[in-house]
Amino acid sequence: MEVTRIRALRGPNLWSHHTAIQSVVICTAEEDAVSSIPGFEAKLRARFPEVSPFQPVGHLESVSLARVLELVALGLQAQAGCPVTFSCTTPTVDKHVYQVVVEYSEEEVGHLAMEWAEKLCNSALHDTPFDLQAALEALRELDEDVRLGPSTGSIVDAAVARGIPYSRMTEGSMVRLGWGSKQRRIQAAEMDVTSAIAEAIAQDKELTKKLLSAAGVPVPGGRSVVDADDAWAAAQEIGLPVVVKPNDGNQGKGVTVNITSREQLIRAFEVAKEFRDDVLVERFMPGNDFRLLVVGDKLVAAARRDPPKVVGDGVHTIAELVAQVNADPRRGSGHSTSLTKIRFDEIAKTTLANQGFNADSVPAKGQRVNLRNNANLSTGGSATDVTDDVHPEVAARAIAAAHMVGLDICGVDVVCDTILRPLEEQGGGIVEVNAAPGLRMHLSPSFGKGRAVGEAIIGSMFKKGQSGRIPIVAVTGT
C-alpha cells in the first residue's frame, strides 16, 4: 500500500461539509481484498481493538486495505478524544487506486492520524510491533497544542451554530469569521474593532483606576512605586493591609494581597518585580472576588472566584493534598481544561507561611488552607456562577467601567462582600478591567451553570440573520 497526494480539505467539499484529510491510496492486487490476506484482520484488531467493523452487518463486499486505512485513521482520532465521525473510501477509474477521505477537527492532528494509521496497517501486514498508547498520546498532545482554547473555541462554536464559516488565520487564536467584505476577526475574546488605545489603558492599572475614579466608579486607592522603601511608604499612606501587584500584569501573576507587615510587603514587592518593573501598591479590599463579563452594553455573565485551597484530613501533608486536588481530570496545566492545577511557587509558600504552614504540614481534619490569597483560575482557583444574583447597580457600574476604558468585551474584577447589594453600601469596588478576558470560568464554572458567552459575543458581531457569507453561484478552475 502506498499513500500519496495527501492534502487538507479546509471547508465544504466534494465529499462532505466536514473538514477532512484526502489522500490517494494505491493498493496491490492482494490488498484490494484484505480477507485474502491470512490473519490480517485478527492482527489488526489485536493491535487496535476499537477499530470499527470493516463492513456493516449484512454486507458481503470485499474490503480494500484503503478502506481499513480510513477506518483506522478515523478511529485513532476518536480514541484520542477528537470529535470526528465522517470518513469514506471511493475507488477511482484506475485499478487498485482509491480516494480516502477522513474528517479532522484539527488539520495537523488529521495528518498525524493518517501517518499513524498507515504504520498500524503495515504493522498488521508484516506482523511487527505497534505501540497504540504512544500513537494515541502523540495525537492527544498535538491536539492539545494546536486546538483552539476555550475562549476562542466557544466563540467559534457559536459562529458555527449560526452557520457562519470560519478559518484559522494563524496557529494561535486568531480566527476569521465569514468571507470577504462580510468577514470579522477575533483573537481569543477580543474583536477586530477593539481599540488598541483601550487595550493599552486596560493594561495600565493605575491609569484605569484614574479614569474609573473620575467617572465615579469606586476603586481602591494606591500608586506606583519604584522600590521596596517607596512601597512601604505608599502602604503607610494608604493604610494596611495593602495589595502589591505588577502595574500591567495579568492572570494574577505576581499579585500578593492582604499584606499586613513590612516584611511581607518587601517579599511581595520582589515577587511583583519579577514580572514587571512597574509595581503598584493599593488598598486591600476585603470581601469576595467576582469577575463580571461585559459584552457591548450588556452584562452577560458573572462568577465568584475562590482562591486555590485544600481541606485537611488529619493524615496527609499539604503537598499530598495538593497532589490529590491536581489529580482531578478537570485540572490541567494550561487553559484548555476548565480548571488549572495548583502550583507550589514562592507566592504559595509565602501564603502558607503566613498561615503558619509549610508543604509538609498536616492540617487538621476539615481545616481549610489557602495556597494563594488571589482567586485567579490561572493559578488554581475555582469559580461559581452568580450571574442571576448581580444587583442592577453593580451591573451598571461594570458596564460603565467597560465603556470608560473603551472595551467592547471586558472582564471587570469586583471585590465586595456580595453582589446582591450596590458596591457603595458595602465598601466594595472595581479593582481591575481586563481586555481579552478568559471565558472558561463562565463556560464551565466549578459550581453552577455555564453561560452562553460565545453566543453573546457572536450576537454583538453579527446581527440576527447575518451569516458573514457572500452568495457563490459557481467555482471554476483548471
Which sequence ranges carry the predicted segments?
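ATP-dependent carboxylate activation and anion-phosphoryl transfer catalytic cores
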Residues: 1-160, 298-301, 306-313, 317-320, ...
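Conserved N-proximal alpha/beta basic substrate-recognition cap immediately N-terminal to
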Residues: 96-237, 250, 473, 478
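A structural signal for short, well-ordered beta-strand segments and their strand-loop junctions
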Residues: 167-168, 280-282, 411
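Short glycine-biased active-site loop of nucleotidyltransferases that positions the nucleotide triphosphate
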Residues: 178, 234-235, 293, 421-425
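Active-site nucleotide/adenylate-binding loops and adjacent lid/helix of ATP-dependent enzymes
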Residues: 184-343, 392-396
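Extended, charge-rich helix/loop segments that form flexible
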Residues: 321-381
